[in-house]
Amino acid sequence: KAIDAVRDATLFTYSGLASNDATVFDFAAKAAAAGKDPKEEARKEGFKPDLRKRGHVRSAFDGRYRFTRYFSPLDHNSPQTLDQLFKWNDVELYDLAKDPGETANLALDRKKNEKLLLAMNRKLEAAIKKEIGKDDGRELPDVAGVTWGLDRIDL
């Protein structure tokens, strides 16, 4: 059976605040190397991860193409146009039939691949709607009002 016989695309998502900003690990390692408690140092220095970084992932694979959006947890989005897609996301698009090693990102040529980018974005949005429902960050921990502003880090 073809991979798309059951659904138009498979969905992969990742939302992890701890790994959204790699400077968290650098900060913790330096504090530990200095013999200090990373949590206490973070509190004293007011260190917080930069949640504007695009570390969250939504990805779809339709049997040939893998389409991935990387976005900030502060900017959950459902882009409908090419401009919106690239405004709120870092984008990857690979043709796994021709490029199984995912080395040639087709999203780098927006103009040439506009129709394919938008088609794969629609498949991704459909998979999100079907499998997640409302994709607004509610899977993230314990933040009232869905603002995602952190006042501490858990190391």
Kindly give the residue locations of the regions a language model identified.
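His-Asp-centered acyl/peptidyl-transfer active-site segments
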Residues: A2-F12
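Short, intrinsically disordered low-complexity segments
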Residues: V6, V57, Y65-T68, G137, ...
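C-terminal, low-complexity/hydrophilic appendages and adjacent surface loops
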Residues: Y14-L108
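Long, internal low-complexity/basic segments
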Residues: L17-A18, D26-F27, K48-D50, F86-W88, ...
